Amino acid sequence: MSDRLNDQAQHRLQKLLRLKQTNNDPYLVTKTSLTHSSKSFQVEFEKCSEEELKKKATVSLAGRIIAIRQTFLIIQDFDGQVQLYINKKIHPKLFDYFNEFVDIGDQIVVSGKPMLTKTKVLTLAVEEMKIIAKCLLVPPEKWHGLTDIETRARKRFLDLTYNLAMRDVFLKRTKIIKSIRSFLDQNGFIEVETPTLQAVLGGANAKPFKTHYNALKADFYLRIANEIALKKLIIGGFNKVYEMGKMFRNEGVDTTHNPEFTSIEIYQAYADFEVMLVLVEKLIQSLCESLNQFSFNWNNKTINLKTPFHKITMVELIKKVTGIDFNSVKDDQSAILLAEKHHVKLAKHQQNKQHIINLFFEQFCEQTLIEPTFVTHYPKAVSPLAKQDPSNPEFTQRFELFINGKEIANAYSELNDPLEQRKRFEQQLEEKQLGNDETSELDESFLEALSFGMVNTAGLGIGIDRLVMLLCECNSIRDVVFFPQLREHK
């Protein structure tokens, strides 16, 4: 490591070596006794007079040094910051220790008495100090000015130290996730766990990560969704279940996509997609109430999350945006001609009306959905696990919630006819032969379970990372994930 250290870092390393030589090795510390955090220190002493502070007992604190100005220091712990003062005349040995060994970035434990400076700033007058972790590398001087998202994500440990606004985002994320669980628990849902490794790919249309299970001598997938397992629980007699966890899709990375992401899927027996539409509205309202905020700025757009949200069918939306009424398009060939006219590229498996409707929506309509909008009744060809609409069998009882052009939630009345489900799986296999590498596999285990009978059921999936982006007003998914995957740093 030393060959790569610059001069300042070499100087820090020499200080560490001297600490060890003088029986002050910071890494031998195993217990740290503290009386206060920065927050409790401020709360207890901020309203005290100088005379009252003189009567207070000794206080011990710990934190990272983020600033040094002569004999004043600022340390920061999880809750905030505290100013320290070293009186050279009263504590000459302490000052010598500070002067010889201490650098910005070091983790220290201190004890002393609270005091007020001449400018009435609450400060700890240090009587004892010990370095408990030496910072060997030079920390950034102006981290707040850093705008390179990749650098911040790659060195999240520094980002969290010197950018407290980023720390607040992750605390808010934790609060949001707790609130989601609390809402569902209060509404009678049971949290469950299902396998991350899956023998059969299914539950969504996406490219998977593949691995090999040595003990079983078989290839497995990291799950792209947990839908199939959760529906098996409904078949097994559970009425309301949900699971929050990691999903994995071997696809692109951008400001709203991360191959490893957090999702929640929710299933309710004896319900349809309209029930889930109401549920997701109530859930988002509950989150806004817990945050005491209903208006959010996301990617320079003001988003109002007060319900009810807008609602429109996919075909109606396409007509509204493009003027094209797909209800009047009678066959695949007519749809193909429309696609050619409007420069919509078609893959081999997309040479039909249903896929073309979905492509028109994705290409021309998604980005127009700024205010929260439920887009309903997706084509059956792109919804292999959704129940068809009895009034129009080309379409399904499905919706997706869009906010600022981004999909936030996806829900549908679950297909529970095992014969129809087998047919849909077979159609997916046909598409795979035509080059669609995002299709589901034929899952005999699921078909067997479905054949024992699944009552009418509704399912809902929500992308937690995107929802947190919105509620924390972050423009990149990397800003709401502690350690997003990045290309190898060269």
From Swiss-Prot:
Note how many cofactor molecules are bound and how: Binds 3 Mg(2+) ions per subunit.
HAMAP family recorded:
Lys_tRNA_synth_class2
Give any Gene Ontology cellular component.
Answer: cytosol
Please tell me where Mg(2+) 1 binds in this chain: E400, E407
User: Where are the coiled-coil regions?
Assistant: none
Question: Where are the membrane-spanning stretches?
Answer: none
Assembly description: Homodimer.
The signal peptide annotation in the UniProt record is none
- Where does this polypeptide localize? Cytoplasm
SUPFAM superfamilies attached to this UniProt entry:
Class II aaRS and biotin synthetases (SSF55681), Nucleic acid-binding proteins (SSF50249)
The record's section on PANTHER family has: LYSINE--TRNA LIGASE, CHLOROPLASTIC_MITOCHONDRIAL, LYSYL-TRNA SYNTHETASE
For the biological process aspect of GO, one term held by this record is: lysyl-tRNA aminoacylation
- On the tree of life, the source organism's domain of life is Bacteria
Specify the protein name. Lysine--tRNA ligase
